[in-house]
From Swiss-Prot:
This is Large ribosomal subunit protein uL11. HAMAP family: Ribosomal_uL11. Keywords: Methylation, Ribonucleoprotein, Ribosomal protein, RNA-binding, rRNA-binding. PROSITE patterns: RIBOSOMAL_L11. GO terms for cellular component: cytosolic large ribosomal subunit.
Length: 141
């Protein structure tokens, strides 16, 4: 018989840097999950993606066991890395902070394709371009 799901927790944690400190500790602690075992497993699984913010979906079962699925980094994080900026524009319609080429947008769209609600690469690229526009990043090409 399948285990009963008690809760699904969604967090964004830096790759390889999960610690029992907030936000991880309190989110898992209130559901009785072994925080250290989650941190250890997450850090092992994301060690190769150092410096990225990784969304994770943790499924907690009634017997306090858990499973988790890591997703691809948010498009905004990937765009900031591609553009070489630390912070997006506070006023994207007035202040443009960087430019990225269509080739970079395509790379990001291909990487994000599995987590996106898009039927083809063109649709995924349009989503990434929209994210770039809302961040004050100009897409060239």
């Amino acid at each position: 018989m399948a285990k009963k799901v008690a809760q699904v927790i969604k967090l964004q944690i830096p790759a390889g840097k999960a610690t029992p400190a907030p936000p991880v500790g309190p989110a898992l602690g209130q559901h009785g999950v072994n925080i250290m075992s989650f941190c250890k497993e997450f850090n092992e699984q994301t060690a190769n993606q150092e410096g990225m913010l990784i969304p994770v979906e943790i499924t907690v079962y009634e017997d306090r066991s858990f499973t988790f699925i890591t997703k691809t980094p948010p498009a905004a994080v990937l765009l900031k890395k591609a553009a070489g900026i630390d912070k997006a524009s506070g006023e994207p319609n007035k202040n443009k902070v960087a430019t990225v080429g269509k080739d970079k947008v395509k790379e990001i769209a291909e990487l994000k394709m599995q987590d996106m609600n898009a039927s083809d690469l063109d649709a995924a690229m349009k989503m990434v371009e929209g994210t770039a526009r809302s961040m004050g990043i100009i897409v060239e090409g």
